[in-house]
Each structure stands twice: as C-alpha cells, then as structure tokens.
Curated annotation (Swiss-Prot):
It is an enzyme of class 3 (hydrolase). It holds the Pfam family Abhydrolase_3. It comes from Rhodococcus erythropolis (Arthrobacter picolinophilus). InterPro entries: AB_hydrolase_3, AB_hydrolase_fold, GDXG_lipolytic_enzyme. PANTHER family: AB HYDROLASE SUPERFAMILY PROTEIN C4A8.06C (PTHR48081), ALPHA_BETA HYDROLASE FOLD-3 DOMAIN-CONTAINING PROTEIN-RELATED (PTHR48081:SF8). Its EC number is 3.1.1.83. This is Monoterpene epsilon-lactone hydrolase. One of its GO terms (molecular function) is lactonohydrolase activity. It catalyses: 4-isopropenyl-7-methyloxepan-2-one + H2O = 6-hydroxy-3-isopropenylheptanoate + H(+); 7-isopropyl-4-methyloxepan-2-one + H2O = 6-hydroxy-3,7-dimethyloctanoate + H(+). Optimum temperature is 30 degrees Celsius. Inactivated above 40 degrees Celsius. Lactone hydrolase that is required for the degradation of monocyclic monoterpenes such as menthol and carvone. Catalyzes the ring opening of lactones formed during degradation of monocyclic monoterpenes. Can hydrolyze epsilon-caprolactone, the lactone derivatives of dihydrocarvone (4R)-4-isopropenyl-7-methyl-2-oxo-oxepanone and (6R)-6-isopropenyl-3-methyl-2-oxo-oxepanone, and ethyl caproate. The active site is at residues 143, 237, 267. SUPFAM superfamilies: alpha/beta-Hydrolases.
Length: 297
C-alpha cells in the first residue's frame, strides 16, 4: 500500500465536500474534476451508443474479446457522475477482463429519481444481451452505482430474465435506511460524510419512497437467486458495513460471494488509477470475471 497515493485519493474525495453551500451542479462539476485526474490511455477505443434508450459509452482496450461485456454503473451518490468520467475505469476493466465495457450514462436524481437510474441500467443490460455474438454479460458498479447494480439484479430476477453471469460491486451503497454501524464508527477515517451521502443524496434518489424499499434499498430486499458476486471495500470508509452486511445477506441467500477488504484504503479506492492497490484490484476483478465466462479463455 502506498501511503502517498492513499493520501492523494483521500484528498480527492475530500475535495467533493470542500465547497460550502454547494449546489447539485457544483457537486457534479467537482466529481467530473476528480474523474478527470484519471488519465485515459491513448489506445482506448471509445464510442457512444444508444443502449435501448439509455445513453452509454463503449470503452475497450485493443484486441479484447467481443463476446464478453461488462455493464459498468458509475458512482456519484445517485446525483452526479457520468460515463465520460468513468472511461478510464472502463478501459482497465476491459483490459483486465478481456471484455468490452458498456459504461451507462444513467439519468440522475433529483431530476430522475428511482426507478429511472435502475431502468437505464436494466435497458443497457438487455441491449448487451441482445447483441449477436455476445455470450457473457457482467454487471459492475461502485458506491451508489453498486447499489443501483444490485437493484438491477433484483429487477431482472423478478422479471424472470436471464441474469448477468456475475457481478462486482465496489464500496456499494445498499442500505438507504442508514443502519450500518460504520457510518458512525468509521466516520473519523472517511473524508466523505457518508451519512450525508446516505440521508441527503439517498433521499433525493428515493423521492419520498420508504428507506427500506426492497428494490431501491437492496439490503432490505430479497437477494435469493442472484449471480456470483465479488464485493470490494476499504477499511477507511463509512460505508464499510454496507459491504460486510451485504456479503452476509448474500451468503444467507446461498449466493456465491467473495469479499475483498482493502486495509487502510478509502471509499471506492479501485477507481483511483494512480494507486497501485487500485491497479491490483482491477486485476483481481478481471480474474474473477474471466473465471465466470461461459467458455474460459
């Protein structure tokens, strides 16, 4: 673990809450500034696409398999973030997983609260599944995007559709009731006020729905029958227990699940491309996804 790189990652996270009286537009601009620090390699292939009505970007490294797709759901507290800002993560996932990344530019709250973001992710997943030659489709999300990804899995299962071959969630926000003890116990370690993320931005996303809504707040839903899932979380984040509680609930539902904990690492640490542990995490994710393709390559 690089202490310097970890400090830099925490500084970038802290910058998101550095502006007093920030508006939603301010937060969105700040998040794009953070994502702009992740340099996209020159050989990245990026192409916009209409994925069954959902805006998205195809992001690929050269020479990757065309038969495998990872639908990527960016983070941003339900209210910010973009596919453009997550091109670099999409590229790393493409390279490590030997796949094409379909990064979804889902609609954001408060303009488009639940279920709009989930609907967009489901639409993009269906689009990926419908493509000729595609045999494997995965779902990957971080933070609020991890929660949206879990909601999409529940939605697809309830609709009786073919599920993703596996899922990966990074520091997922899955309990909008804010019942994870780490929101308080680990607050001093986290540069982000995670409780504000849950209560404030989560409230905009719910738009009056119950904080224990079984789809919008997946920790309070039925997780039986979901695909194999890899969960990554850092020790230094308020949402730590959202991940550990999710893993426990998935195990109780007889879902294949693996947990990776980054010691001393902050919220959504795998997105910070300059950090050696983030690069290692991407390699681990790629290994996990490759182990769940229909015909291992």
């Amino acid at each position: 673990m690089s202490a310097t790189d970890t400090a830099r990652a925490k500084e970038l996270l802290a910058s998101l809450v550095s502006m007093p009286d920030a508006t939603i537009d301010d937060f969105r601009a700040l998040y794009e500034q953070v994502c702009a620090t992740f340099e996209l390699p020159d050989d990245a292939q990026v192409e916009p696409v209409d994925a069954n009505g959902a805006d998205a970007l195809w992001v690929s490294a050269p020479g990757v398999s065309a038969d495998t797709v990872a639908v990527v759901v960016h983070g941003g507290g339900f209210t910010m973030g973009s596919a453009h800002g997550y091109r670099e993560l999409g590229y790393r996932l493409s390279k490590s997983g030997n796949l094409r990344a379909l990064v979804v530019d889902y609609r954001l709250a408060p303009e488009s609260p639940f279920p709009a973001p989930v609907d967009d992710v489901v639409a993009a997943y269906r689009y990926a599944r419908s493509l000729d030659g595609v045999e494997n489709v995965f779902l990957v999300g971080d933070s609020a995007g991890g929660g949206i990804a879990m909601s999409a899995l529940i939605t697809l299962r309830d609709a009786g559709e073919q599920l993703p071959d596996a899922a990966v969630v990074l520091s997922p926000l899955v309990d909008l009731a804010g019942e994870s003890p780490s929101l308080v116990d680990r607050a001093h370690l986290d540069p982000l006020p995670a409780a504000v993320l849950v209560n404030g931005m989560g409230g905009l996303y719910l738009n009056g729905l119950d904080v224990r809504h079984p789809v919008a707040s997946p920790m309070h839903g039925d997780l039986t029958g979901l695909p194999a899932t890899l969960v990554l979380v850092g020790t230094d984040e308020g949402l730590h227990d959202d991940s550990t509680r999710l893993v426990d609930k998935l195990k109780a539902a007889d879902v294949e699940v693996q947990l990776e904990i980054g010691e001393g690492l902050p919220h959504i640490w795998p997105i910070f491309s300059f950090h050696p542990d983030a690069v290692a995490a991407t390699d681990r994710i790629g290994e996990f996804l490759r182990s769940h393709v229909a015909a291992p390559r």
